[in-house]
């Protein structure tokens, strides 16, 4: 009789699950229940991620509106700058027609100006720019010998500097507009879809905890975008990877398009609050390029200053009037060029902000998409618990902790040590949270 009772007890024990080192092992049914609870948490995190995606999308749209406003200001400043530059060029041409006047006086002063200008410039270069003084000295000698005092007298260096600056500004603007237009075409197609406009975000159409047939409500099946992400009958179950991968690909493409040239713009904006004449880096660059930077130092040489003050009105009264007109238009052109630089710098910053937001969008969405990419079967669990061990069943697990092995979709197994008992109501929430954190961390490292 005792033997019979013992056998009955053993059978009952086996039906309730095997015992290991005094602890009852987790049954398959309990593992399924834990997987269901963990999957609900992952589903909630996916919904939160999509809500954040929409918030970032709103910020991108706001940044784009600010960019449009800046673009309008840039176009206005560009028009004024070009008008002033045209006036400057026209007046310069007229002045060149009378450059023979006072030529003897200017040439005498120029011969005394050149040695001082060369010495002053080379001292500056050796002290500030340092590299390649010998080559620069030879280049400067040729530049001064080929230049005329008339070029000096009409501030030809300032005119040339403006023209070069205008060329670079146009080049920079072309680069930024090309990058933005490439990204904008992708973002327009991405954001115009009702997936991003539905309120509130609802992931039930791909959730294993609800009907999947609601997916068709989010897309216009006639659009190219819808055809790309719905290569299957309209009312069939949606595949997680097919749903998300196109979004991730488009966001990634938009970010790449924006960053293609934006961070390699070959132009240094003038530093805010720093006078142009004290911008040593720009002066060094000009001196190395064609020696015109040396003409910035003309005020340090007496004979050079005298050339600038030569009055030829006795020979031709209209010449001094033209020179004054040139000076006025030159000042206006420099003023609008500086304004354009400031607006261009703000525009670039706005573009960088958009690029940064696209990066956030990419990072926020990528983990969802990458998880979806791992899904190769119809398993209804986002998170699947495969093993659970405590100290009683596995002596290597410290007392009071629980060792859990899980899989997110079809990902690699993730081993977690949880500072809670299985009986804790928050146990699976902690497991799911830790699993997602580990997955995101590994994704970033890869």
UniProtKB/Swiss-Prot annotation:
<dbReference type="InterPro" id="IPR016015">
    <property type="entry name" value="Clusterin_C"/>
</dbReference>
<dbReference type="GO" id="GO:0031333">
    <property type="term" value="P:negative regulation of protein-containing complex assembly"/>
</dbReference>
<keyword id="KW-0539">Nucleus</keyword>
<dbReference type="InterPro" id="IPR033986">
    <property type="entry name" value="Clusterin_CS"/>
</dbReference>
<dbReference type="GO" id="GO:0005737">
    <property type="term" value="C:cytoplasm"/>
</dbReference>
<keyword id="KW-1015">Disulfide bond</keyword>
<feature type="disulfide bond" description="Interchain (between beta and alpha chains)">
    <location>
        <begin position="116"/>
        <end position="301"/>
    </location>
</feature>
<dbReference type="InterPro" id="IPR016014">
    <property type="entry name" value="Clusterin_N"/>
</dbReference>
<feature type="glycosylation site" description="N-linked (GlcNAc...) asparagine">
    <location>
        <position position="290"/>
    </location>
</feature>
<dbReference type="GO" id="GO:0099020">
    <property type="term" value="C:perinuclear endoplasmic reticulum lumen"/>
</dbReference>
<feature type="glycosylation site" description="N-linked (GlcNAc...) asparagine">
    <location>
        <position position="353"/>
    </location>
</feature>
<dbReference type="GO" id="GO:1902230">
    <property type="term" value="P:negative regulation of intrinsic apoptotic signaling pathway in response to DNA damage"/>
</dbReference>
<dbReference type="GO" id="GO:0005739">
    <property type="term" value="C:mitochondrion"/>
</dbReference>
<dbReference type="GO" id="GO:0043065">
    <property type="term" value="P:positive regulation of apoptotic process"/>
</dbReference>
<dbReference type="GO" id="GO:0048260">
    <property type="term" value="P:positive regulation of receptor-mediated endocytosis"/>
</dbReference>
<keyword id="KW-0968">Cytoplasmic vesicle</keyword>
<dbReference type="GO" id="GO:0005615">
    <property type="term" value="C:extracellular space"/>
</dbReference>
<feature type="modified residue" description="Phosphoserine">
    <location>
        <position position="133"/>
    </location>
</feature>
<feature type="glycosylation site" description="N-linked (GlcNAc...) asparagine">
    <location>
        <position position="86"/>
    </location>
</feature>
<comment type="function">
    <text>Functions as extracellular chaperone that prevents aggregation of non native proteins. Prevents stress-induced aggregation of blood plasma proteins. Inhibits formation of amyloid fibrils by APP, APOC2, B2M, CALCA, CSN3, SNCA and aggregation-prone LYZ variants (in vitro). Does not require ATP. Maintains partially unfolded proteins in a state appropriate for subsequent refolding by other chaperones, such as HSPA8/HSC70. Does not refold proteins by itself.</text>
</comment>
<dbReference type="GO" id="GO:1905907">
    <property type="term" value="P:negative regulation of amyloid fibril formation"/>
</dbReference>
<keyword id="KW-0256">Endoplasmic reticulum</keyword>
<dbReference type="GO" id="GO:0051787">
    <property type="term" value="F:misfolded protein binding"/>
</dbReference>
<dbReference type="GO" id="GO:0051082">
    <property type="term" value="F:unfolded protein binding"/>
</dbReference>
<dbReference type="Pfam" id="PF01093">
    <property type="entry name" value="Clusterin"/>
</dbReference>
<feature type="short sequence motif" description="Nuclear localization signal">
    <location>
        <begin position="78"/>
        <end position="81"/>
    </location>
</feature>
<dbReference type="GO" id="GO:0061077">
    <property type="term" value="P:chaperone-mediated protein folding"/>
</dbReference>
<dbReference type="GO" id="GO:0005743">
    <property type="term" value="C:mitochondrial inner membrane"/>
</dbReference>
<keyword id="KW-0832">Ubl conjugation</keyword>
<keyword id="KW-0964">Secreted</keyword>
<dbReference type="GO" id="GO:2001244">
    <property type="term" value="P:positive regulation of intrinsic apoptotic signaling pathway"/>
</dbReference>
<dbReference type="GO" id="GO:0048471">
    <property type="term" value="C:perinuclear region of cytoplasm"/>
</dbReference>
<dbReference type="GO" id="GO:0032436">
    <property type="term" value="P:positive regulation of proteasomal ubiquitin-dependent protein catabolic process"/>
</dbReference>
<dbReference type="GO" id="GO:0002434">
    <property type="term" value="P:immune complex clearance"/>
</dbReference>
<feature type="signal peptide">
    <location>
        <begin position="1"/>
        <end position="28"/>
    </location>
</feature>
<dbReference type="GO" id="GO:0005829">
    <property type="term" value="C:cytosol"/>
</dbReference>
<dbReference type="GO" id="GO:0051788">
    <property type="term" value="P:response to misfolded protein"/>
</dbReference>
<feature type="glycosylation site" description="N-linked (GlcNAc...) asparagine">
    <location>
        <position position="373"/>
    </location>
</feature>
<keyword id="KW-0492">Microsome</keyword>
<dbReference type="InterPro" id="IPR016016">
    <property type="entry name" value="Clusterin"/>
</dbReference>
<protein>
    <recommendedName>
        <fullName>Clusterin</fullName>
    </recommendedName>
</protein>
<keyword id="KW-0496">Mitochondrion</keyword>
